Amino acid sequence: IGPEVHVMSVCQPTVPVLGAISLMATAGEIAPRSMIMMGGPIDARKSPTAVNNLAMNKSYAWFENNVIYRVPANYPGAGRRVYPGFLQHAGFVAMNPDRHFTSHYDYFLNLIRGDNDDAEAHRRFYDEYNAVLDMDADYYLDTIKLVFQDFGLVKGTWTVQGQPVRPQDIHRTALLTIEGELDDISGAGQTEAAHDLCTGIAAQSRQHFVAEGAGHYGIFSGRRWREQVYPVVRDFIAAHPHGAASARPRKNPAAREAA
């Protein structure tokens, strides 16, 4: 898609995005100008949430035996192993049942009062919140093992087709990480950990931002996204039209001649 690209990843994709750009950098390929990582588990050991604890306290086999199903007959992809969308949805709702109950009760009251604006805002939110997709089983299980159990990226043990994933090889891609102050899915510091891994990017080409009062969804949707987060993303991309400054020390001409 060309070199003039800025990549944004939200939640789970932050890890494969960082992995892909690391491999591109190691291979000497043209990499994106910047990478924006939002609310993702780069280092899931930091400030573990209920999501992290579940993944760490259950075995790989438990997930394979309890949340993986085959698509029924008469549906597209029949027979394919997936982590079903309805289970994902049930899991998210179960994390904050009181909040969802209150939200729906308030929605009912708004309908009675004729408060159409608040009622419509509720419908828009849940139209997105309830939109789930069956996830390929191998992708889901690989994520559980690599990200939440083995911590392969931060420990430096992750390899792709025999090639080690080395974030320290990234030099020309600027890095912006974004976290929500109240995020109960990706805890504080999990996304910011990318800065500790990307040591080849100069400090002036790296930035971390915490959205005050924002939960997980607030950093990429709704008012807090529009008013707090989007301006930061916009300005960061505009400030790095040619990529990042490298943190690698440059040899002076005399040193190059001596070499």
Predicted regions and their residues:
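Gly/Ala-rich beta-loop-alpha elbow adjacent to hydrolase catalytic centers
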Residues: 9-17
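Active-site nucleophile elbow and catalytic-triad environment of alpha/beta-hydrolase enzymes
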Residues: 148-167
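Conserved alpha/beta-hydrolase "acid-adjacent" motif
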Residues: 184-190, 202
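Catalytic histidine neighborhood in serine/cysteine hydrolases
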Residues: 197-217
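Catalytic histidine-centered segment of alpha/beta-hydrolase-like enzymes
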Residues: 211-227, 247
